[in-house]
Amino acid sequence: MAYVLVGRLSINVYSPSSPTDEEWDAYLKYRVQHMPRVDAVLVYTQGGASTIPQRERLNRMPPRVLGVLGAVVTSSVYVRAMYKARPETHALWRVFSETEWDGAFRHLGVRHEERSTVLATVTKLGVDLGLAMPLLPS
């Protein structure tokens, strides 16, 4: 799992496996630290997702940490179904396939001139994790 703040957008990249508890706890600290400056969260995952106990810890976070727009982009049917089934994120979060980046950007309010930077950041985080990254739209 890797994440970085780009402007007011938090970009998160997951590998095909779930984050370890150590990774997840570090991520929760990052969320608390940076969320006052974050308007939206973009998650790209190749199949990894938080575990039930990890989501329970996330759901105990302050409302400002949870109350932001989010988009999950993935080719994983499992991850798409899991996010769609989460009532706590129903109103603010949307799930998109890897062919629907434009929809994710529209949902998050990412401007056209910012999109190439966001996609380059997603690719860099994935490569840093050792992932074989698909060709993302330009």
How should each PLM-predicted stretch be described?
Residues 1-138:
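Amphipathic, Lys/Arg-enriched alpha-helical "gate/interface" segment within cytosolic domains
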